[in-house]
Amino acid sequence: MVTGIQITKANDSALINSFWLLDEEKSQARCVCAKSGYSEDQIVPMSDLGQIEYREIPLEIKPEVRVEGGQHLNVNVLRRETLEDAVKHPENYPQLTIRVSGYAVRFNSLTPEQQRDVIARTFTASL
């Protein structure tokens, strides 16, 4: 269990009024903030703090959120005819932007092969 503390008395004056997170299981202390001598997030053995007096600080520890895996979906809201016409008449569609692999790209900046590939992947005959 992790305990939050504010050191009120210590032999080392740099520790006074500093805030720490104590992990009893690992016998470690993590500095939250100190005036000098210790940096934020510095981890030291609890024994390095020496003889100290402190007051406990209430902590609200939220469970760690883990997100693994996931899906990615590109959605182009166009008709097939619009893209096919943009291939034939690019001058009529100078601002036509589509999503390709998570990036926004101007359709006319793609090579003809890439344009055909986008049309083939975007529009299928059946699922």
UniProtKB/Swiss-Prot annotation:
Protein keywords: Organic radical
GO molecular function: formate C-acetyltransferase activity
Domain Glycine radical per the UniProt entry, residue ranges: 5-127
GO CC annotations on file: cytosol
Keyword Chloroplast: no
Domain of life: Bacteria
One Pfam family it belongs to: Gly_radical
Modified residues (Glycine radical): 102
Role, per record: Acts as a radical domain for damaged PFL and possibly other radical proteins.
Matches recorded under HAMAP family: GrcA
Protein name (Swiss-Prot/TrEMBL): Autonomous glycyl radical cofactor
Species assigned in the record: Pectobacterium atrosepticum (strain SCRI 1043 / ATCC BAA-672) (Erwinia carotovora subsp. atroseptica)
Lineage: Bacteria, Pseudomonadati, Pseudomonadota, Gammaproteobacteria, Enterobacterales
Gene behind the chain: grcA
